[in-house]
């Protein structure tokens, strides 16, 4: 049995990506239902506050995510969402019979912005919670962030650089995110060590598009209209050749 906890950003900055997020999550969920083994799924949506839409449901019973649950609003209370979920799952495991505690627990956290609205938890408290669960119970935590330095932000609350990745927060990037998440979940559910290159496809997507942007900027700059000083320089450089260019005879 695997405990899966998804903590998904639905703050206002995610506007325009609702359909992509819903589609990506549902596609991942359907893929996981076809894999061997049982899993319990919890899904927490966060903005100003956290909303638990799936509380330890058997994987096969997880309904599709819809626009009724996933709509964007508010700010980014990331720490409250993460801290609250760890506290909830930790307490259940603490008081459950030993044989009822899942062998593996995995948290997947996605956000497109920095923490800016938590009231109950701070970085230090969440960091201590995460480090304790990793060291004592071998919980896995993945952090996928857009428009931020994901590795630096993850480190602030105890998630290593090898478990964090920057992604492009658009239609293509969001779809790829959930494909990669699904692959990582499959590894953990199968009791395989999570490969160091679990995030390779996301890294490659980001790098490829950054190169494309740089190339586009280069050509845009190269073909931009020359300034007066540039034009003067060009005229000076070609002036020695001008004498060699035949001219029409003047009219007398």
Please name every model-derived segment.
Residues 237-249:
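Acidic, low-complexity, intrinsically disordered interaction modules
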Residues 1-214:
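Acidic, low-complexity intrinsically disordered regions
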